[in-house]
Amino acid sequence: MSSSKRKRGAETAAEDCDDGTDKSNTGNSFFDIYGPEAKAELDFKSPETTLNLQDVQGLVTWVLAEGFMPSWVFIKNKPLIPKVVLLYLPGLDAALYLSHSKTLSSLKSCCGNPMALLALSCVVDEMRTIDTILTCKGRKKKTVTSSVEPPPLVSSPEACNLMGKSFVELTKDIPFPVSYYTLSQKEMEQNGYTFEKLELTPTLPAPSGSCPPEIVALDCEMCITKEGLELTRVTLVDIQGQVLLDKLVMPTNPITDYNTRYSGITAVMMEGVTTTLKDIQEEFLKLVFKETILVGHSLENDLLSLKISHNLVIDTAVLYKHPHGRSYKTKLRILAKKFLAREIQESESGHDSAEDAKAAMDLALLKIKHGPDFGSPPEVIRKKLLAVLNESGKTTSIIDNINIVKRYASESSNAIPVSSDDEALSKAVKEVKNKRSQFVWTQFSELNAHFQSRADDPQKLNSRLAEMISLLTCNKKSGLKKSNVSPETKEILKKMNERVQSLYAALPTNAMFIVCTGHGDTSIVHRVRKMLKDEDEIGFDREKLVKVLEELQAQAEVALCFVGIKQ
């Protein structure tokens, strides 16, 4: 059967769902249509496809609500599916599953081979994974009372060239004052501008009677020394695009890596450079005063490398909001291409701080000229997945800890708080057998809680890190894949397997069973990141610990999704 015929057949079947029959008798009606031997089946179009969390949510809304047909799986006889059970297993990444697939045999026996699932970054809160699955997002519909259409995006370099004009000309008849776009104290704290905790030199008030520049853009480049990244180039440009300052700086410590790919700095360029950090600070403070608005992209890094504090900042990484929220920031190169039709950071010789500073200034001026809504992603509305399913006439149950139940249950959901995996299994089995419940969510969290407890125990943490460093040192190719698993972890995996089997056994025929692991052991990732940040805590070679972190993070971000239909 061709994919187009499959789609038409599925759509026809979906239309039959809305014929006004009683929802509780829908299954019997469809068995009358398809015959007593009919069964729902899955056809994975591309088993090698890597899914994301939205794909998992999309599968649920396609089966139970008015979602879109997934591109990665075809469901034969979809109307025969009486319910969907979604089980969340945090902590189980692909590597752990593959190394203990025999212990976790029920997953394959129930659902077949898993598909790779790209987890969210380990940097974000673990709750974001659940939020991504249990919260549906859509663009807000425009209404008659909506504000005026935002200006079109710039399509050519000439159209966006705001440089060459004075501050007065550029700020004439603007929607909001320039100060509106500077970071608030809270925003500075949220984005790493923690000046008060460090010994930094503050910018000073302008001398009486002087005319300090109203707004300037800053960009710095760094090379790597034994102490990490250190300042090697400072560039300031004014509102007209003129370079006010552009100097190379000799780091305090010897350079170990010129970081040319990103910094654009080479050994030849640094020959004969005698300007010190103190020298460049003095020059900087003669151009940037307390009243000056400083523009840049992720300026907290530049100011920290300069060891200067300044509280009047327009940060284009914050100014242009990322579609996925505050935890993400769009790269300057992408913003320049999208809003300025300008290619930057393309040279093989590395970044150009003057080019980057001008791009940041142009982006800030565009926002100032057109207003705060310019360049903002479409307004998104968030609805609970369970509410979306309820609106489609489906009855839902959520079985989880009290915080998750309170946060994601809809007004019509059967909300069941539990405090252990055994209790979650018991309640889930009951709901699965309830013919009126068409969607059931639950999670088994013992493995993830075990990882959290282990990461919080200094002795266990240090022992595990020592083992990992040893593995990396002895066999770089094998990475951490052969790391030993403790008897306690094995026992938890065994119990997880038994619970999965018990839950599956309770499913009615043709029920869809989705098992999503979400992420691996992020607890140890967060702990190691903190150790590297608080250098006094490190009891290992820093370079080796960084390599361990890279391995841990890469492993934790490859999760799995199992999908099966009870036969």
Swiss-Prot record:
User: Which intervals of the chain are annotated as region Disordered?
Assistant: 1-24
Q: Which Gene3D superfamilies match?
A: Ribonuclease H-like superfamily/Ribonuclease H
Where it sits in the cell: the answer is:
Nucleus
Q: Tell me the domain of life.
A: Eukaryota
User: Which InterPro entries does the record cross-reference, listed alphabetically?
Assistant: Exonuclease_RNaseT/DNA_pol3 (IPR013520), REX1-like_exo (IPR034922), REXO1/3/4-like (IPR047021), RNaseH-like_sf (IPR012337), RNaseH_sf (IPR036397)
Which residue numbers delimit the Exonuclease domain?
215-364
* Cellular component, GO annotation: nucleus
Q: Does the keyword Nucleus apply?
A: yes
Task: Tell me which UniProt keywords the record has, alphabetically.
Answer: Exonuclease, Hydrolase, Nuclease, Nucleus
Q: Give the EC number(s) listed in the UniProt record.
A: 3.1.-.-
GO molecular-function annotation terms?
exonuclease activity; nucleic acid binding
Task: Mark the transmembrane ranges.
Answer: none
Chief site of localization: nucleus
Q: Does the keyword Transferase apply?
A: no
> What family does the entry list?
Belongs to the REXO1/REXO3 family.
According to its UniProt entry, the function of this protein is described as:
Probable 3'-5' exonuclease degrading single-stranded small RNAs.
Q: This chain belongs to which protein, by name? A: Small RNA degrading nuclease 5
